[in-house]
Design a protein with these regions (language model features):
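A short, basic N-terminal segment
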Residues: 1-106, 259-272
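P-loop NTPase catalytic core of nucleic-acid-dependent motor ATPases
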Residues: 94, 105-125
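Short glycine-rich substrate-engagement loop in P-loop NTPases that contacts/grips substrate
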Residues: 106-113, 144-182, 191-199
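Short loop/turn elements that form and flank the Walker-type P-loop nucleotide-binding site
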Residues: 121-122, 150, 177-179, 210-212
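Walker A/P-loop nucleotide-binding motif
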Residues: 121-140
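Residue-level preference for the first positions of well-ordered beta-strands
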Residues: 123-127, 154, 182, 214
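Walker B catalytic acidic pair
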Residues: 187-188
């Protein structure tokens, strides 16, 4: 019995509130000088009435604020882990709509990102096509990062990266890809053209189709080349893509060429 009493006494001591400047006694209990609510309360334990420490209103608000801040910190860590897991290229993790030029192409992609829940439920993706260097990869990555910001798993990769990833088999590739609610496959048509590559490309896209999960593809191929490929082995792949993804033509300027020109101007200025 003495052990129980000693333990109870220890709990009571630990529950004793800290008296701060402005605190006061009222009705035999300690009150907070800030919020005017009690920092002590009376509790009946057996035949005895004990005075124990309790949280005043402002202490409770502080505790809730700390809990919220910790939950937000944990969520930021979780999102960052998802981002690192889904986007191997560190630079691509920084592609955001906030840093993008406000163009019609970007606005359309932003609408898709803003309504991703609808796209996820419908299993609808995008096919971003157009000439090289006009921002397709950037825009697709902006969508992925916007989705990740909401804590939804997304992956940005390419078939060359997948094919060189050292997977044990195609089934392992499919399982890995389907962990992500959004999959961005960059530069379709740039992969090696051999039987293994062909089957892997088809398997990834077909498994995505079967899973009902959205897929965003970027490509330099035209819609005509996708509808009527020179290599008929790709017909079933491109048919799947056109079935799953809404085509969005990127008519933007060649940003890589513009950047190259800017770099050249900078160099010329240095050489003056």
């Amino acid at each position: 019995m003495s052990d129980i009493s000693d333990a109870l006494a220890g709990v009571i001591r630990r529950a004793e509130p800290v008296r701060e400047s402005g605190d006061y006694i009222q009705d035999g209990l300690l009150y907070c000088g800030h919020c005017r609510t009690p920092k002590q309360c009376r509790i009946k334990l057996g035949d005895a009435v004990r005075v124990l420490g309790c949280q005043c209103a402002c202490a409770e608000r502080r505790r809730e604020a700390e809990k919220k801040a910790e939950a937000e910190r944990q969520e930021r860590m979780r999102i960052e882990e998802l981002r690192v897991s889904g986007i191997a290229d560190k630079a691509v993790r920084g592609y955001t709509f906030e840093s993008a030029e406000d163009t019609p192409d970007i606005r359309k992609c932003r609408v898709y990102a803003d309504h991703f829940d609808d796209a996820l439920n419908a299993g609808k993706g995008l096919l971003l096509w157009g000439n090289t260097g006009n921002g397709k990869t950037f825009a697709a990555s902006c969508i992925a990062n916007a989705v990740l910001d909401r804590g939804i798993p997304a992956m940005v990769t390419s078939f060359p990266r997948i094919l060189s990833g050292g997977w044990k088999d195609r089934e392992q590739i499919a399982q890995q890809m389907n962990r992500y609610k959004l999959l961005v496959l960059d530069d379709l048509g740039a992969e090696r053209q051999n039987d293994f590559a062909l089957e892997t490309v088809y398997m990834v896209i077909d498994e995505r189709y079967k899973s009902g999960l959205p897929l965003i593809i970027t490509t330099n191929l035209t819609l005509d080349e996708l509808a009527k490929p020179k290599n008929m082995d790709y017909q079933r792949i491109y048919d799947r893509v056109l079935e799953m993804c809404t085509p969005l033509f990127f008519a933007g300027k060649n940003r890589r060429r513009e950047q190259a020109n800017e770099n050249l101007k900078w160099l010329k200025e240095l050489m003056k």
